[in-house]
């Protein structure tokens, strides 16, 4: 996928313009995956909010930070309904047709990993 499409997708969903000469290397909501050219989504986690790691993200080379929490920082783009927009953005960004994606939920105390493995194997065999 060309970089121009990625830039347009970000502008379409978040209203942010990234100069075309800035290469987007990855998108992440995990500080462990931030590198030069990353877009970091600062979201609510289990014990903290991604906005707590803005300085770290910038130090690691993030070119854009999109946060679900209002932050007084010019480098952070606030999107109050980030969770509602994010899924549509990811489908668009990775050029995935939503109708082709299937989700399965596996719950219970025991056997989840085995069932997930078997379900994956069956769906892969069915594609052939």
Q: What do the PLM-derived regions correspond to, one by one?
A:
Residues 1-88, 92:
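N-terminal leader/targeting and accessory segments in enzymes
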């Amino acid at each position: 996928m060309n970089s121009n499409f990625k830039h347009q997708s970000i502008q379409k969903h978040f209203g942010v313009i990234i100069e075309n000469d800035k290469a987007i290397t990855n998108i992440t909501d995990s500080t462990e995956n931030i590198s030069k050219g990353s877009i970091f989504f600062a979201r609510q986690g289990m014990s903290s909010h991604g906005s707590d790691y803005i300085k770290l993200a910038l130090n690691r080379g993030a070119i854009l930070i999109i946060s679900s929490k209002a932050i007084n920082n010019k480098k952070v783009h606030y999107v109050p309904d980030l969770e509602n927009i994010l899924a549509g953005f990811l489908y668009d960004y990775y050029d995935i047709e939503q109708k082709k994606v299937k989700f399965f939920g596996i719950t219970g105390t025991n056997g989840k990993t085995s069932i997930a493995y078997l379900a994956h194997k069956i769906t892969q065999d069915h594609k052939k």
